[in-house]
């Protein structure tokens, strides 16, 4: 079994009226089979509205299948007890990187991931320092994230 695997994957978005009542559905994914071995690089291509983003959101359990099954590292994305493990195994980079900037300064941005994994604060600061040193940005750790700093942030992202 691959790192990412889907069998007969189906996903439908609900259509709702003004009061929020379900009045129908739109099938965005219809019977997709995919098997991606660990370490592979895969491009998912298609025109607007073809289901690329919907499929990607299944790969880290942001969405769960309406039908069929999606596994990430052997874990079924429909199992609520596996969500934490799945999301540690598979991340997502959004189309516009600025939409995923969390911190206001570089060191906050670098420390965001380990903080969400429950890494102790002292260890986070050590990792932040080591990471910024590794990419030659230690002296810019308190740089505010603005459009002027975008080129520097590309080193961090």
Residue ranges and their predicted role:
Residues 6, 122-140:
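Conserved ABC ATPase "signature" region
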Residues 45-47:
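The feature captures the beta-strand-to-loop junction immediately N-terminal to the Walker
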Residues 60:
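Helix-to-loop junction immediately C-terminal to a conserved catalytic motif
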Residues 68-78, 86:
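Conserved ABC transporter NBD signature motif
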Residues 98, 104-115, 125, 129:
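Short helical segment in ABC ATPase nucleotide-binding domains corresponding to the A-loop/adjacent helical element
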Residues 145-151:
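Conserved small/polar residues in nucleotide/adenosyl-binding loops
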């Amino acid at each position: 079994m691959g790192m990412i695997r889907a069998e007969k994957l189906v996903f439908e978005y609900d259509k709702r009226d003004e009061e929020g009542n379900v009045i129908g559905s739109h099938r965005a994914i219809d019977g997709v089979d995919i098997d991606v071995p660990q370490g592979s690089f895969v491009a998912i291509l298609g025109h607007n509205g073809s289901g690329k983003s919907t499929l990607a959101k299944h790969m880290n359990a942001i969405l769960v299948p309406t039908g069929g099954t999606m596994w990430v590292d052997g874990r079924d994305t429909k199992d609520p007890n596996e969500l934490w493990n799945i999301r540690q195994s598979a991340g997502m980079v959004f189309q516009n990187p600025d939409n995923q900037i969390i911190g206001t300064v570089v060191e906050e941005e670098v420390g965001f991931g380990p903080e969400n994994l429950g890494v102790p604060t002292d260890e986070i600061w050590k990792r932040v320092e080591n990471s910024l040193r590794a990419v030659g940005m230690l002296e810019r750790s308190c740089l505010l994230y603005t459009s002027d700093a975008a080129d520097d942030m590309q080193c961090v992202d």
